Design a protein with these regions (language model features):
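N-terminal secretory/targeting leader peptides
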Residues: 1-179
Length: 179
């Protein structure tokens, strides 16, 4: 899979979430919403052709036993959201800045550790599977193919909401690795 057109007709296991179904369908795949615990058996039984998961999930289920290829699309960011009550934060006075600074430091450390673990997993999985890394141009084609899903979400939540989510996603994304 190097282009969205390569997914035409592929039975792709996705999380049981409407947005994941819409994303798969926008790419031309046949979305198969399936509970995660059933994934490995569905691959072995050829009930699905492919799946999309984080590297930790691929490794955790030893999916190299039932699929040969690993396409590193880097299509999703699992973000951690930190919420705070504005009144309580304001009541901290100057302590609020300490909380914000500590949170910023903790998030930076978490991102760094996540990147380190992802790189380790990618290297380990490359020993067991054929790893294909998509270049920036290919990733851009996937983004373009799923633009209608962004538009659908924007209609449901409002343009401002989707713009804020996309801006936060860009801000949280680690710097691209050299290609």
């Amino acid at each position: 899979v190097h282009d969205p057109s390569d997914l035409a007709g592929v039975r792709l296991r996705v999380q049981q979430s409407p947005i994941n179904v819409h994303l798969a369908e926008a790419l031309g795949a046949i979305a198969v919403p399936l509970p995660f615990p059933q994934l490995a058996e569905a691959l072995r039984a050829r009930e699905i052709d492919a799946q999309e998961n984080a590297l930790a999930n691929v490794a955790g289920l030893a999916l190299w036993e039932s699929q040969r290829y690993l396409i590193a699309t880097r299509h999703a960011l699992s973000a951690h959201v930190v919420l705070a009550n504005a009144e309580i934060l304001a009541a901290l006075g100057s302590g609020a800045a300490i909380v914000r600074d500590a949170l910023r430091d903790a998030l930076a450390e978490q991102r760094s550790e996540t990147e380190r673990l992802e790189n380790e997993l990618r290297d380990e999985l490359a020993q067991r599977m054929i790893l294909i890394e998509l270049d920036a141009a290919a990733r851009d084609r996937f983004v373009a193919a799923t633009r209608l899903v962004h538009d659908r979400v924007a209609r449901a939540l409002g343009d401002d909401a989707i713009a804020r989510v996309l801006a936060a996603s860009v801000a949280a994304r680690p710097a691209p690795s050299p290609e």
